[in-house]
Amino acid sequence: LGTGPSSFQVRQRLVGAGVEVLTPELVGDIGVVIQLIDKGGTMCSVVTAGVESEPSRTTLDRIELREGDVVHVAASDMTNAHAAVELSEWAAALPPFVTLVVSVSPAVVQVPVEAWETILPRADVVTMNDWEASALADILDRTRCGSTIRSYMRPDAATVRRVGNRGCKLQLGADAPIITIPAFEVAIADTAGVGDTHIAEMCAGILLGHDLETACLMANAGAALAVSHESALPVPTREQVDNVLETGVVTNILR
């Protein structure tokens, strides 16, 4: 976060939610996202970068990591050449007691391929939707003919593929069967932030000590709540997610 007004607002929200910011503030402000939503609820984002595109390896190395921590790095974090090097190399050097979640995100085509080659071998979980998976596979294949996303990952690492209203598909290892995690039925009002919500809920499940299959079911519940109302905010609470898991019923959390 920076010193500007947008950073101030985000910091206030984080403090209100009990989230500690571990990195020092930078001079400047965070970027801005303009979201375009069509009548069917499909969302497209236009992003301008800010201080978040200037991570420092020195600052990252000062973060105190503890056993059981989860680190999430998204493709959108690595679209800047400097950020791609700093984040991918830091993530690749994370200690084994930290779970690294890498999300491919719509910005996949803007990430230098070297960053993917650096970060994927360390990833414990790679999450993506169908389009993102296809785009990344094409990029890697063009770089090294015949290679796939799995070619760069450890055999024991997991992949999560989000498939919209069909939920998500989980593979716990290279030779493991694909497990379909069902979605929850919901009327879609707005898809803004649904991918981010799914990833965040999954990471929360991992932090709580759940197995990845349970964490993905939590993620599906959170995603269903996220699309039940207009706007990416507010994000679902733990109580709301638990209620969906218990009842199977999704209601608009703004009503």
Task: Cite the ranges covered by each PLM segment.
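Ribokinase/PfkB-type carbohydrate-kinase core domain
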Residues: 3, 8-25, 37-178, 182, ...
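Short alpha-helical
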Residues: 5, 29, 187
